[in-house]
Structure formats: C-alpha cells, structure tokens
Amino acid sequence: MELHFNLELVETYKSNSQKARILTEDWVYRQSYCPNCGNNPLNHFENNRPVADFYCNHCSEEFELKSKKGNFSSTINDGAYATMMKRVQADNNPNFFFLTYTKNFEVNNFLVLPKQFVTPKSIIQRKPLAPTARRAGWIGCNIDLSQVPSKGRIFLVQDGQVRDPEKVTKEFKQGLFLRKSSLSSRGWTIEILNCIDKIEGSEFTLEDMYRFESDLKNIFVKNNHIKEKIRQQLQILRDKEIIEFKGRGKYRKL
C-alpha cells in the first residue's frame, strides 16, 4: 500500500477543499480494499450521492469517506444532525472511512468504523449556524469516536504503518454479529465493550465489571437489572470469541 497522494491530479485546481476531496478519494480508490472481504479496488458511487462514496462490488458493503489534514482526533465532522439520527435509527448507514494525512500529503491514519458501531450516543449535535451564515440555522453533527469501543475502530493504516489486511478483515468480521441485534440490544453490547476498554491490562474479573454498574444505570435508566445484563453481555462476547472465560469469574481480552 503506497501512502503518498498523486499530486499531479490537482495541479490545475485552486480550491483547497476540491484538492483534498480529489486526492483522498483517488487514494482510497487506488490503494484501499474492502475491509469485509478484502476485495480490491473499491468502486466509486456517482458524484454527489447523499449517503456513501464507495462500495464493494463483491460483498456490497458501502463506505462514506471523511478526511482531514493534520492529526487524528476523536471528533469527526459529519452532515445534518437530523438526517444522521434518522439514518442511525433506521439502520441504513454506510460504514465510515476516516483518513488523516500530513502536510507532505501522505496518509498517516486510515480507519474504518463499521456502521453497526454508530449509535445515537456517538452522534453529537452541533450549534445552529449563525443568522448571518449562508445556511442560517442549519444544525450539523459530529461523530464522537470516544463513544465507540476499540473493536469498532479498525485501522488499515495507523501512525503511518500499514496493517496486515488479513487482521483487518478478521477484526471487521468479528463485529458483524451486532447487525442482527436491535438498536437497543446493540447499545448494551457496545457499552459493555466500552467498559472492558477502560480496564487496564488483558485480564479482568466479573467484579471489575460490576464497578461500572452505576455508570450503566445512568445510561440505561429504565433497567433495574444491571448486573444481570452485564453477565448476559459477557456471555455474548464469550460466544463471539471477543473475550475468553478463564473460570471463577475471570476473563481475558482477545
């Protein structure tokens, strides 16, 4: 995988935003692959399609590209807040590609956020545009990656290093079971994964998980059986080989 952009494509362009779009989309087309099946190359959707930018003609996964110059951050600008919330709740989102590049026009981070990991909690409403703005009153949103567990942030390129495509596809497929869950059930699994991420080291206990009871109660205020849900979700993650049960209330992250 070559990390440099093809700068010859934008020699006649003056708009920085146009340059960025052309360079990043060209790079994804030439260098990326489908993280679900490994197929290469991905295909472009027609221009100005409102939802996705790329699709895989082998497995039909769709991807929307977001890119920025500079360091990777946990907050990603997206489109209209109301539209995004409808898409998440209707389960008709594409997957997201997030790409960052250096001042030398070289990719330093490129990750995929599988669509099933995007929940209403990870969508942050922005302030309405000022009355003097061209689109006065328009309300956009950000995707908050800090609300997404590590299992939902799959790097193809991380800190300038290309990751093994086989590991990428394995990690992508590992989370596909969530697509069969309801939005509510999926939210529970994602929050349990977030709790596991907060525990240092590769091993943890059931008691470690019970310490998140009050945090989970604040999220799922109508649920009065938090500990039971914790055990249920740990069983699901065991069955999906995301964690390993070592006996006597002990677990290991896989």
Curated annotation (Swiss-Prot):
Superkingdom of the organism of origin: Bacteria
One GO-annotated biological process of the protein: DNA restriction-modification system
Sequence similarity: Belongs to the DpnI type II restriction endonuclease family.
InterPro entries reported in the protein's UniProt record: DRP (IPR010324), DRP_C (IPR041368), DRP_PD-(D/E)XK_dom (IPR043025), WH-like_DNA-bd_sf (IPR036388)
Organism: Streptococcus pneumoniae serotype 4 (strain ATCC BAA-334 / TIGR4)
GO molecular function annotation: type II site-specific deoxyribonuclease activity
Catalytic activity: Endonucleolytic cleavage of DNA to give specific double-stranded fragments with terminal 5'-phosphates
CDD domains: DpnI-like
Protein name: Type II methyl-directed restriction enzyme DpnI
Keyword field: Endonuclease, Hydrolase, Nuclease, Restriction system
EC number: 3.1.21.4
Top-level EC class as recorded in UniProt: hydrolase
